[in-house]
Amino acid sequence: MSAGSDAEMAIFGEAAPYLRKSEKERIEAQNKPFDAKTSVFVAEPKESYVKSVIQSKDGGKVTVKTESGATLTVKEDQVFPMNPPKYDKIEDMAMMTHLHEPGVLYNLKERYAAWMIYTYSGLFCVTVNPYKWLPVYNPEVVAAYRGKKRQEAPPHIFSISDNAYQFMLTDRENQSILITGESGAGKTVNTKRVIQYFATIAVTGDKKKEESGKMQGTLEDQIISANPLLEAFGNAKTVRNDNSSRFGKFIRIHFGTTGKLASADIETYLLEKSRVTFQLKAERSYHIFYQITSNKKPELIEMLLITTNPYDYAFVSQGEITVPSIDDQEELMATDSAIDILGFSPEEKVSIYKLTGAVMHYGNMKFKQKQREEQAEPDGTEVADKAAYLQCLNSADLLKALCYPRVKVGNEYVTKGQTVQQVYNAVGALAKAVYEKMFLWMVTRINQQLDTKQPRQYFIGVLDIAGFEIFDFNSLEQLCINFTNEKLQQFFNHHMFVLEQEEYKKEGIEWTFIDFGMDLAACIELIEKPLGIFSILEEECMFPKATDTSFKNKLYDQHLGKSNNFQKPKPTKGKAEAHFSLVHYAGTVDYNITGWLDKNKDPLNDTVVGLYQKSAMKTLASLFSTYASAEADGGAKKGAKKKGSSFQTVSALFRENLNKLMTNLRSTHPHFVRCIIPNETKTPGAMEHELVLHQLRCNGVLEGIRICRKGFPSRILYGDFKQRYKVLNASAIPEGQFIDSKKASEKLLGSIDIDHTQYKFGHTKVFFKAGLLGLLEEMRDEKLAQIITRTQAVCRGYLMRVEYQKMLLRRESIFCIQYNVRAFMNVKHWPWMKLFFKIKPLLKSAETEKEMATMKEEFQKTKDELAKSEAKRKELEEKMVTLLKEKNDLQLQVQSEADSLADAEERCEQLIKNKIQLEAKIKEVTERAEDEEEINAELTAKKRKLEDECSELKKDIDDLELTLAKVEKEKHATENKVKNLTEEMAGLDENIAKLTKEKKALQEAHQQTLDDLQAEEDKVNTLTKAKTKLEQQVDDLEGSLEQEKKLRMDLERAKRKLEGDLKLAQESTMDIENDKQQLDEKLKKKEFEISNLISKIEDEQAVEIQLQKKIKELQARIEELEEEIEAERASRAKAEKQRSDLSRELEEISERLEEAGGATSAQVEMNKKRETEFQKLRRDLEEATLQHEATAAALRKKHADSVAELGEQIDNLQRVKQKLEKEKSELKMEIDDLSSNAEAIAKAKGNLEKMCRTLEDQVSELKSKEEEQQRLINELTAQRARLQTEAGEYSRQLDEKDALVSQLSRSKQASTQQIEELKRQLEEETKAKNALAHALQSSRHDCDLLREQYEEEQEGKAELQRALSKANSEVAQWRTKYETDAIQRTEELEEAKKKLAQRLQAAEEHVEAVNAKCASLEKTKQRLQNEVEDLMIDVERTNAACAALDKKQRNFDKVLSEWRQKYEETQAELESCQKESRTLSTELFKVKNAYEESLDHLETLRRENKNLQQEISDLTEQIAEGGKHIHELEKIKKQVEQEKCEIQAALEEAEASLEHEEGKILRIQLELNQVKSEIDRKIAEKDEEIDQLKRNHVRVVETMQSTLDAEIRSRNDALRVKKKMEGDLNEMEIQLNHANRLAAESLRNYRNTQGILKDTQLHLDDALRGQEDLKEQLAIVERRANLLQAEIEELRATLEQTERSRKIAEQELLDASERVQLLHTQNTSLINTKKKLENDVSQLQSEVEEVIQESRNAEEKAKKAITDAAMMAEELKKEQDTSAHLERMKKNMEQTVKDLQHRLDEAEQLALKGGKKQIQKLEARVRELEGEVENEQKRNAEAVKGLRKHERRVKELTYQTEEDRKNVLRLQDLVDKLQAKVKSYKRQAEEAEEQSNANLAKFRKLQHELEEAEERADIAESQVNKLRVKSREVHTKISAE
């Protein structure tokens, strides 16, 4: 590396002397005298290494003289040669001649002494903390390093940053800078400098401001400002560092395609939240607390309600409160400014300060203990008020939540009391949680602000994470931090050493693999492997009873002695207790595991968190918006997390984040910066040798230098090398012929004058030693300088030669011009020449003018063309620029796509290899898992065998219980003897007290036995084997029977007391029976009320049927009237047409008669008669109209009265319904009271049972022990037989249950098939009904066609009438004309008369034909009416079919209810089986506890037995046979002592195995819980299927109901019956508690339906009124038509009369004209009336259509109500699940339900057409309740039997416990031996279990890795395919262009 001159260093300004030695120093160093043979470094204990000079050598010893003048004699291997002076303070230690520890140490020390803190060490940079400010980060330094290569500038963090930046731009690869080192080494400062550098060099060109949204500064300012804010909340003073980062951060700075800043983001790790509440003495909490209290911003003090003295707050004053190197006031302003720059809103800013202040107040909250209670209560509320105010909470709610939190137990929440310490712990946890979540929220907000949404391509990541920590007290936080450093060190080693050497092998370079001893895999696997420290910690967190001790024991069992990195710490005085030690790369660390389980689970007070979530402060509420407690997570995400945990632990989250970080780092090109802490005292310039050497070793600095020297750190591809360095010797590579790049590179390097041992040729690259590539670069620069100089000389020579030629041409031209000018000067004065001068221009002027004109035209054309060509040229230039830009972009895109494609292919290949390896591992693990499953199956079989033997022993226990009854009989015989033993009472009282205590202990042990089920099974397995041994021991114990007899009659008083207690118990039992009788009487009363309601329902059903009949009759009448109205409407229209035609004819006739000369007198009289008849007809018409109107009004009134009556009936029914609902609620309250009474009775019963047990225990103390021991063997045998029979009985019951389940499954399938069949039948019936409806529609259509035909005939008739009228008018005209011209035109009149007579004859014939046709039409009308009647019959048949369908539906409902009943019975039986199983488990558990407790008291009893035996031996000595008994007792004593030793050893083994067995039991219980949850899930799925079926059938039923909407109109009659039935149902539903919701939902649906029906009824009423109006109008039209018909007939008669008396008609002509005029006016009025009626008809039709549309809407609403009912049915199913506890109350209603069923059958016949749907529902409900009543009665009977049995069992068991206590001496030996065997069995089982768990864990992990690998492979393959397709498209596009 070439050192720059002082002039070159001038650009660094005042930083130059801190970066590189001056030229003067370098020259002095080179001229410094140096003896390479004698100048050495020597190892020395104090200084590690010292500079020395060799004095002499003697064999393997060397004598040296140190700099301080001391003489030392050391071994040769402790002497290291010194580097020449020119290497002093060398910038890259890899360049040193002698590379060793002292050389590196002293180079760093000398540079540090000269304040050159940065030094290269091979491929990475080493920096030493100066502990003072140096001017090496000034802006001029930043500018000086920009764009400089590494070897062109001194070592600096800016150089590393710039190299990473340049690599990112040139290599198009993400970069990372890993700044690592111990705490206090300067990592955070260097991180800030890196960010400063990028923010300076990568800004946009004109420093544009970001004006979007909330941003207050540029992106560069925000990136820089993020550090002060994060440091304020995340940095604190520690022992080693005043500004220590207590969290790790990975800052990614994203750059755009041009290398400018695009955005940034920050990821944080491991915030040390415990520092919020606890600090060591020499440390302090986070800076923000002390910044706030610095009083720089007084408004904060006032806003946060705090003081300026940190000592007032406990959380922040446990250590120091000031730091000399930090000005808290200035830091507060910087923090406040950073918050503003980063775009936090004012509200968010205030929230940050308030939450910080609230944390401070939390530490001052005081609590005290209540008097005579452990419950905590607040000791003052002032501090809590402040904290709650700052968090926008209610102070009382906060204190209540802290002291009385609500805890979820099952599905309910209960209030839990807290001790004072628990409350303080909760407050501390909440403070830490608030602070941590606020910190993470701030990081998220910063990231949102830094994300500018600009396009970004690559990023540079800067990692600043807490360094390695070794404290006196190291906890879980230190383990996580140290583990992170282990992983980073491993990544560094892998990148620097392993990958480097693997690259050599891959390229085929001769290389001997060097093991640098930096393999950290052992320590990492110890921490993170499946059975490592984190795995065991997470496993312990899953167990509720796990403690720190159990965690430590598991760690020791798993790793102590098995791993060299796991050690047991040695106790050291003055230091905190350590539980285990880990050997890290940086040293051995002692860890204290106190509180690790709680830290890992990180529990919070859920009640306070709930308050936080509801806080008015948005920030606080958002912090905890996603929080869910462990219980809630367990319920919501069961099985979703790894290893079955219901929540993610701190360690799991930490490992997940760490893995993400390592993945990010592996995807980048890393640059390493090693920070070194020079001393522990923070003294500038001082360096502790041992401390620095330790860091150099641990950081891998020396190994990095060594491999850099030995290896080949620089490499380049052959093609690139040939292209770049060909210039060094172009002649070495021949031109014009192909030559391989590798051979060309070899020739080129061979021809250059360099050291040929400094490079190697690989397969694809050429490798260089350190420094050689730099030398080649310098040679290339020199060669390029030479070539450029030569090129410049040639170019300059060429240019000068061209200029010389131009000069020659100019010279010749000048000579020519001079010659011509001289000649001209000689001849210009000649006369001829003057004339020539004058004439010559004139000759050419004309030509010149023409030429000028031509030239102008050409000039103009040329100018235009030039303009066009210029525009075209510009356009083409723009296109060319655009195309060039697109071409460049495409080339860049193709290149990037090619690079990414290659990378993706490489990753894909790697993933495929990993996948294959993982598949092989999975196959292996699967095989091992199968083996383990087989072993588990064998263990399960053994377990079942043990269970069988346990059942046999239970039978033996039952036999023992029978002895209680016998002892009761003997009690009376002992009463007389007790009087004689009263004197011995005092001596025996103590024994009795002991026995009582032992009895209680045995009972407690009996209860505890349930927790150790598996261990007891093993013990029971050997009890049967010990029976023979017990028989032998009985003979030995017979000698002690005499003394035991005395204990039979010792407590007469106790007996009397027991008898009194028994009497009290009997009296309480009688009270309970009386309460039961009262309940029965109440139930009977309710049954009587139900029967009354049923009778009411029947009456209402009868009324409903009558109303339905009336409605049907009215509907039929309405239809007939509608048809008549239509017919009359048509006939009326035709009559109107006829009337108008006749009017016109009359007018014509009158005109003709006037023309003929007037009318005769006869005609006048006829006209008068006609007029009178017309007046008469008009009066008749008006009278008929009035009569019809009166009739219509009467009908209307009648209809309105009927509607009002029906409304009143509806209101009455509503009131009845409300009354019934009220009675229902009252009955429900009574049922609740009865339930509470029953619970009180049950409690009283339990208390009585306890009293009975106590009395029985006291009675058992009076029992004789002689006969008990005498009968012991026989009773055990009997008990065994009984247990065997019970086991057989249980197995038989189990088989029966299985058979029942299978039978129910079959019945379920049959029910499903039956349901499908019913569905099919329903569809067929629906199809038939649709066919009938279609036929009815077609018939109606035919009817309409015939009606139209009838109307056409009427129109024809009207036409004839018009013709007749026309003829009459003609007659009148002729008459008039005749009167005028009678004399003149007599003949004409005669002819006209004849013609008129002919025309009248023809008209009469036509009229007759029309009348005949009308008669035929009447017949047709009659026939159609008959057809309509037939269709009505068909409709009735359809209704009958609907009724049949209803009946089938009811049958279906019956089948469904029976199936539901069977299902519920099966579920109840399943629950009872589960209860029995739990009861048996409880009993077995109690037995096991009793046995274990008997072991505890065995020794005491044995000593007592020995004393008794000694007394027996003393008594026998007084007799003659004393000696013999003593000898026998001594034998027994020896034997017992020997057995005692054996038992003691076995007992210890059994205890150890018992612990293992307990762990096994816990694991099995977890597995059982998982299986149970799976079964519950399947049951839930089945329930959902059943619910779906129910919903489907409900929809079918509701659809059928919608087809009967017409019948719903008759609901008023059926309402009374329905209400009565609902009342009965409500009486029964009182027993169903939560199932009442179904009734409520159904009631609401019914009300909605009633509302819809009321609307429909109103529309129907409107339609009926409209129909009545139409009927009235029809009657009017009919009367008018009849009048017209009569008028036509009279006109016909008039015509005949006119023919006979023509003369009279002439006289009456004038009157006829007047009448015609009157008729005309009347006709016009009738036409207007007709139009009005037609408008009314059209309006009525529109109203009818509206009614139809409204009915359709009502149908849609009904369907919607049906869907709502289905949803409510689903909710009902959920609510029914909670009604199991009321089933016992339902059983008493069985008889009532049967009566209801009978009456419902009768009601069904009465209301077949009425309230069918309601009755069907009620019947189904009744049947359901009937089944439930039966089940409840059965269960009640079984419960009574079980109660009696359990009472008997309790008595027997209490007696048996006394028997066990007395017989414990004989059982001792047997139990000890059993325990020994149990130990061995447990040990074997535990080992198998552990091996199985380990294998399963490995299998799961491998399976998970395989899945991830497969996913990655698939993703990579898809990406490769996409990239290939994209690349092809790009190439195609380029080629097309």
UniProtKB/Swiss-Prot annotation:
Family annotation (InterPro entries): IQ_motif_EF-hand-BS, Kinesin_motor_dom_sf, Myosin_head_motor_dom-like, Myosin_N, Myosin_S1_N, Myosin_tail, P-loop_NTPase, XRCC4-like_C
Q: Which residue positions does Phosphoserine occur at?
A: 625, 1091, 1095, 1161, 1236, 1260, 1291, 1302, 1305, 1494, 1513, 1553, 1573, 1602, 1713, 1725, 1738
Region Disordered: list its residue ranges. Answer: 1125-1171
Q: List residues binding ATP.
A: G181, E182, S183, G184, A185, G186, K187, T188
Which parts form a coiled-coil structure per UniProt? 842-1937
Tell me where it resides: Cytoplasm, Myofibril
The family annotation for this protein states: Belongs to the TRAFAC class myosin-kinesin ATPase superfamily. Myosin family.
Q: How does this chain assemble?
A: Muscle myosin is a hexameric protein that consists of 2 heavy chain subunits (MHC), 2 alkali light chain subunits (MLC) and 2 regulatory light chain subunits (MLC-2).
Q: What is this protein called?
A: Myosin-8
Q: Name its species.
A: Mus musculus
